[in-house]
Amino acid sequence: NFRNETVDWKHLAEFNQSEGIVVSHDVNFRHLKGYLRQFFTRLGYDDVRLRPAYYPYTELSVEVDVYDDEQAEWVGLGGAGMFRPEVVKPLLGFEAPVLAWGLGPGRIIMRQHDISDMREMYRNDLELLRDTEAWVR
C-alpha cells in the first residue's frame, strides 16, 4: 500500500499490513482490547497504548501504540476496531460482532532484529540477508 508520508526511520512510501478478524456472537470491544494488549505484551512490549481512532469500516476504533525506549517516543503499530453492522451483513450474510485489526510487521521486525531505521530492511545488503535467519521469529 502507498502512504503519503515523509520517509524517515519509521516511515516508508509503502507499507505492508497483516490483518485478522474474529467473528462471534460472544465478543465485544473489551475482548478486542484484551487480544491487542496480550498480543503486543507477548511480543515484548511493556507499554501498550490504545488511542481512539477513526477508520471508515469500524466503530469503535483504536490505534495501537507502543513506547520505543531507544527513540523515546510512542510508535504506532496498527489499528483495530469493531466492524460496522452495515459492513458485516453484506460481507457475511448475517449480523454478528466482528473484531478486526491490521498490524504493520515492519516496526515489529525492527525491534526483533535491533534495526534502528526501517530503510535498512530494504537495502540490497547481501551480508545482512545472509546473516539474518528470518525476519519474523
Question: Residue spans of the language-model regions?
Answer:
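TRNA-recognition modules of translation machinery and tRNA-sensing kinases, especially anticodon-binding
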Residues: 1-137
